Amino acid sequence: MELKLCVCGVLLVSLTISGSLAQMDVCGVAPLNTKIVGGQSADAGTWPWQVSLHRDGSHFCGGSLISSRWVLTAAHCFPSSSLRGLLAYMGRDNQDFLNPNEVSRSVTRIINHPDYEDTPNNNDISLLELSSDVTFTDYIKPVCLAASGSVFPANTNCWVTGWGDIQSGVPPSFPQTLREVEVPIVSNSDCSESYNTLTDNMICAGLTEGGKDSCQGDSGGPLVCKNGTVWVESGVVSFGRGCAQANFPGVYARVSRYQTWISQQIGSDLPGFVTFVSDGSSGSDGSGNSAPGSVHLVYFTVPLLFSLLPVLFSVLVLS
């Protein structure tokens, strides 16, 4: 019995670690992203985890590929659980021309956070299960997710992407190419002066003077921050007052608050979770290398271990 328990324990940990490590090998890596400073339209492949969600042929929300079969997005994008006409496009560059690097999948399951509240958009996060796995390419890769304990100090520079309006009520022009904007993190204490319904499940980003922000149609898309050599999703586009208004930064669901919930829903093929820790400074670490923060890889989670306990039980008790 002791030997059997030991062997099963080693097997359990080995399988769990190997599965998570496989995801960590690819998440947050964007080979075609050579960006240093901001632009407007993003080159194809710059943000390979960006997902375009379509209902009956029209884009309505963004999302992020977080593993070969799962997309992270916003709960407010899905007031209904209907799967009719719902498609997810990965590797898409624009909404009007052909996209030779894209693939599409239907969505087989929508999992809104059980504690989502449409007022004040608390826990505005959702998971979508795709109909089949997608193959990773330079144009299609998963993003790393901020792990529990991640810290995003004020003025940490991050990027938000999407096909939303370029300003309130003004849709993007033909051919509706994926757009990007660089925005600094705003502390929750400062952000709460603009939004009195702000909670710890939210993170804010934007310029005090306005002019740069996510907008309608960007909902569910990623706010990502570079951590060493990988990109980490810190937030999911949630809400704001208008678009890019002065003193009203964009508000995002804080991804690091949901590591346990995400892991419990997915069970296997877990995303790569990275603990983002930054001093809020930009530039170099003195060696000529960019040093926005440090990376601590999270290889496996307690929920996944518990999900495998029935297997161990059957092996130990029934054999």
Predicted feature descriptions by range:
Residues E2-L72, L87, R92, F273-S319:
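Protease-domain processing segments flanking chymotrypsin-fold serine proteases, especially trypsin-like
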Residues V29-K35, L53-H54, V71-A74, P79-D118, ...:
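Conserved H-D interstitial segment of serine endopeptidase catalytic domains
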Residues A30-V37, Q50-D56, A147, T156-A291:
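Extracellular trypsin-like serine protease catalytic domains
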Residues S41, F97-E102, T119-N122, T137, ...:
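Gly/Ser-enriched beta-turn/beta-hairpin loop segments
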Residues T46-P48, S81-G85, E102, N123-I125, ...:
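Extracytoplasmic
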Residues G57-H59, C77-F78, N94-Q95, E117-D118, ...:
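Solvent-exposed loop/turn segments at secondary-structure junctions
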Residues V71-A75, N122-A147:
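Conserved active-site neighborhood of the chymotrypsin/trypsin-like protease fold
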Residues N99, I111-E117, D133-S173:
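Active-site substrate-binding loop(s) of clan PA
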